[in-house]
Amino acid sequence: MNFSGFEFSSIVAFFLLILQLSTAAVLPADYAYGVADEMSALPDSGSLFAEQRPSKRAQTFVRFGKRAQTFVRFGKRGQTFVRFGRSAPFEQ
């Protein structure tokens, strides 16, 4: 079998690609830098990468009727609560 330089390099590149893909499928990513450890995999508590839960934010809107009231909306279904506003007239 006579191989030209281009054919031979193509065959070698193909086998190297197959070898690399099969090695990546066999070795998990955790072992790329040594043996994975449960505690060392977790970030430090003061780290920027520590898990932070998003704060529960409420959508605030104002409705203008007889008097302006500010409402706060929580949750997926949009439960509405009166946050600020007067339910009774001013005492004089």
Swiss-Prot record:
Subcellular location: Secreted
Residues with PTM Phenylalanine amide: F64, F74, F84
GO CC terms: extracellular region
Domain of life: Eukaryota
Transmembrane segments: none
Keywords: Amidation, Cleavage on pair of basic residues, Neuropeptide, Repeat, Secreted, Signal
GO BP: cellular response to carbon dioxide; negative regulation of nematode pharyngeal pumping; negative regulation of striated muscle contraction; neuropeptide signaling pathway
Tissues where this protein is expressed: Each flp gene is expressed in a distinct set of neurons.
Propiece span(s): 25-55, 87-92
Residues of the signal peptide: 1-24
Assigned protein family: Belongs to the FARP (FMRFamide related peptide) family.
Function: FMRFamides and FMRFamide-like peptides are neuropeptides. AQTFVRF-amide inhibits the activity of dissected pharyngeal myogenic muscle system.
Protein name: FMRFamide-like neuropeptides 16
Organism listed in the record: Caenorhabditis elegans
Gene that encodes it: flp-16
